[in-house]
Amino acid sequence: MAKKSKIVKDQKQRELVLKYAKLRLELKKKADYAGLSQIPAKASPVRLKNRDSIDGRPRGYIRKFGISRINFRQLAHQGKLPGVRKTSW
């Protein structure tokens, strides 16, 4: 489990990215790089770190499900992830 402060910081940063997304797109189309530099650097979607949506864990992130490998395993064993089956080869 990540610290509460890290989870809150990540949520605030995602809100900031959404807030400036439209403006960033317009400025990029116009090639107004001076205007882009006036926008906060944290508003860039490149700076986002993928975190587990359940507990905020930053590592072992599975993009398709938006959770970490640990939570993926727990939910898969409980049968709470549709379309996921245990396999062996």
Swiss-Prot record:
Pfam families named among the record's database cross-references: Ribosomal_S14
Gene Ontology biological process terms, A to Z: translation
Cellular component annotations (GO), alphabetically ordered: cytoplasm; small ribosomal subunit
Keyword RNA-binding recorded: yes
Classification via InterPro entries: Ribosomal_uS14, Ribosomal_uS14_bac/plastid, Ribosomal_uS14_sf
Free-text function comment from the UniProt entry: Binds 16S rRNA, required for the assembly of 30S particles and may also be responsible for determining the conformation of the 16S rRNA at the A site.
Family annotation (NCBIfam families): PRK08881.1
Listed name of the protein: Small ribosomal subunit protein uS14
UniProt source species: Onion yellows phytoplasma (strain OY-M)
Encoding gene, per UniProt annotation: rpsN
